[in-house]
Amino acid sequence: CEFLAQQTERRNQRAQLIAERLEKAQIPGALEGAQRLAQGGAVTRGHFARFLVECGKASSMADVFKKYLARGKTGYVPPQWCTIEQSIDVIHHSGGKAVLAHPGRYNLSAKWLKRLVAHFAEHHGDAMEVAQCQQSPNERTQLATLARQHHLWASQGSDFHQPCPWIELGRKLWLPAGVEGVWQLWEQPQNTTEREL
């Protein structure tokens, strides 16, 4: 798919730029180290962070982001993502359901969060992540309300990228009343007994 090739190229360019910025900050070999840790997959900031911890440039992943990879820091390069419309279209053409991931983590004001969800729904998004670990009950209620208002299904998620102490996979991910899980839209495989009948 041409779209995925473009996204992959954008990620690769970003990784190259991050490595160049780290090189200028006297941290050589960052791209090679991140690629080694990615094991043939897409290189992310998480791989650079693990490399920098390995090199002793920081004591933890969180420390790496504070010192090097967060917005305004030496190794920060803004991502170049596709539009919401493009991503929804590609997901739907692939037979998937488009889900707005962790909208509560974008540090948006209530006004801009409402605009984001409305825009996503207007372009035929299917669901939004309502339940996340380490989330206040108030935020979960607010996200569920937005999902209901825009007739979106709900999802749950941990935003897990690598093991870390603050993410508890599968814990505290209940959905508030009044929203339905997007997984109810998925085709359920028939068991062997049903197929034989």
Feature names for model-found ranges:
Residues C1-A118, E180:
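Extended substrate/RNA-proximal surfaces in nucleic-acid metabolism proteins
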Residues L4-Q7, S59, C82, Q86-L100, ...:
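Charged catalytic cores and adjacent phosphate/nucleic-acid-binding surfaces used
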